[in-house]
Amino acid sequence: MTRKQRRLTIIGGALFVLAVAAGLVLNALRDSIVFFSTPTMVAEKHVAPGKRFRLGGLVQPGSLKRGDDLAVTFEVADGGAKLPVAYKGILPDLFREGQGVVAEGALDASGVFKADTVLAKHDETYMPKEVADTLKKQGHWKDDYGKPQGAAKPGAVSMREGEKTAAGATQ
């Protein structure tokens, strides 16, 4: 083998090893890149019990139950699937039903997500992008989702000194 052939073989081998290493790293990070998984994603992936991940969605109205010693259970939903969550600790001040939440923990053998951290978004109109996409796909999306409370409806005009609304009323 000539020097040129040997050099090309070494360069080709190095590139192959680099490509394999990059593929292994990307494969290992594939699940870690997502900030959180929605209940639908968890159901589709069949996440193994004990595997840590972040769960995001909306706290299902009527599902919040408080127990002894700061124990709380609630359901996180994304419009498609619901996942029961158990947490023991102090909840954020802004945590409430219908609110966006991200919980970190793992599934137990019975399918309950055991959270050790719960975060609530400060904006009551917060909705994770994945949840909004799921709601749109399933036809449950309402146009006023994601707008601050009290926001003007399309076609309305502000009510400053004598201005008219779209309906024609004056102040």
Curated annotation (Swiss-Prot):
Q: Name one GO molecular function term.
A: metal ion binding
Compositionally biased tracts (Basic and acidic residues): 137-146
Which positions in this protein are listed as binding heme?
A: 122, 126
Quote the InterPro entries the UniProt record gives: CcmE, CcmE-like_sf, NA-bd_OB-fold
Pfam families xrefs = CcmE
- Can you cite an annotated GO cellular component? plasma membrane
> What does the UniProt keyword field contain?
Cell inner membrane, Cell membrane, Cytochrome c-type biogenesis, Heme, Iron, Membrane, Metal-binding, Signal-anchor, Transmembrane, Transmembrane helix
User: Transmembrane segments in this chain: where?
Assistant: 8-28
Describe its function. Heme chaperone required for the biogenesis of c-type cytochromes. Transiently binds heme delivered by CcmC and transfers the heme to apo-cytochromes in a process facilitated by CcmF and CcmH.
Please report the name of this protein according to its UniProt entry. Answer: Cytochrome c-type biogenesis protein CcmE
Recorded source organism is Bradyrhizobium sp. (strain ORS 278)
